[in-house]
Amino acid sequence: MKDRILNRGGSDHTIMKISDKKVLVTGAGGFIGSHLCEELVKSEARVRAMVRYNSSESHGLLEGLPRELYNRLEIVSGDIRDIDSVTKAVSGCDIVFHLAALIGIPYSYHAPKSYVDTNVVGTLNVMQACRQESVERVIHTSTSEVYGTAMYIPIDEHHPLQGQSPYSASKIAADKIAESYYLSFNLPVVTIRPFNCYGPRQSSRAFIPAMVSQLLSESVIKCGYLAPQRDYTFVKDTVAGFIAAALVPGIEGMTINVGTGKKISMGDLLQRIMSRMDLMKQILPEESRLRPPKSEVMALICDNTRARAFLGWEPGYTLDQGLDEVVSFVKSNSNRYKTDHFVV
């Protein structure tokens, strides 16, 4: 992948340009995907949102968008494992944001093949369809989990990759499929590698909303291992990185980390959440919420030099500002959250 570093303009300029584009978002019903669709519609892009077909005809987290924005989406159902539905969804689009994936790390220990089918074969289908339809730019979504336990921090894009779970291994393979389509076929791919992302609408599978939900309703807080360190980025900042990556010229073939560069342990984060909520409760780590020892990733801290230099990107939300938004959302939507649903 390319290693050149250039100075680029800021995000305000690039967001205005998205209004010229017809875009596809795969995984649109997910957490980041729904926020990306929301921002794209606000920015006057013509948005086709691909959600996984289901018998209830649910559109996932897109249904939480304000109605006036939701109604401006072109929603299509399909499955990225099916090349025909992917090709149909890609047809006529200028830019493709590929976010669809199986993301739960714990389930990958039990059903690794399903992660290969969706994350690897699905990504292959998206790249092939984009090549066939001659799209202008493909934004492929990676994850900081591909780095495994850090050999050094902060982690830059040159850090070795290590598959410490079947999930992360499948994402490494997907990243390499995307890279191969750039190198072999000159497909204009940019890979965005987000570090831990959080914000409103995130499910209780994730640490922050799970802890907020428990604090609101339980006397004892059940959690997993609290020593690992993470770099948490508010979802609106992550989305700004995606949009900039779609529009900044000359960055095809690059992988770009998106994260704040600030570290916090899970234990300190839980204390920070309790402080913001003014609620102090007993903490009880549970073995069932722990990863296998060799699979645990102890530190994921972002070096965002490349995002700042190439995309003109920088985080706009402090951790406290973002936590306050999550707390407000969970309080207003407590019926959506199960306090026993948190997974590692």
Set out the residue ranges of the language-model regions:
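Conserved C-terminal active-site "lid" loop/helix of NAD(P)H-dependent oxidoreductases
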Residues: 235, 255, 290-314, 325
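A short C-terminal helix-loop "cap" of Rossmann-like NAD(P)-dependent dehydrogenase/epimerase domains
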Residues: 67-73, 185-188, 212-222, 248, ...
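N-terminal Rossmann-like NAD(P)+-binding domain of SDR-like oxidoreductases, especially those catalyzing
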Residues: 3-197, 325, 329-333, 342-344
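Hydrophobic alpha-helix immediately C-terminal to the catalytic Tyr-X-X-X-Lys motif of short-chain
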Residues: 173, 177, 181, 211, ...
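Residue-level signal for the nucleotide or nucleotide-sugar donor/cofactor binding architecture
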Residues: 81, 110, 118, 165, ...
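Non-catalytic, hydrophobic alpha-helical segments
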Residues: 238, 242, 258, 269, ...
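Glycine/proline-rich active-site loop of Rossmann-fold NAD(P)-dependent oxidoreductases
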Residues: 172, 197-210, 219, 235-236, ...
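C-terminal "lid/loop" region of Rossmann-like NAD(P)-dependent oxidoreductases
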Residues: 225, 253-256, 267-270, 278-299, ...
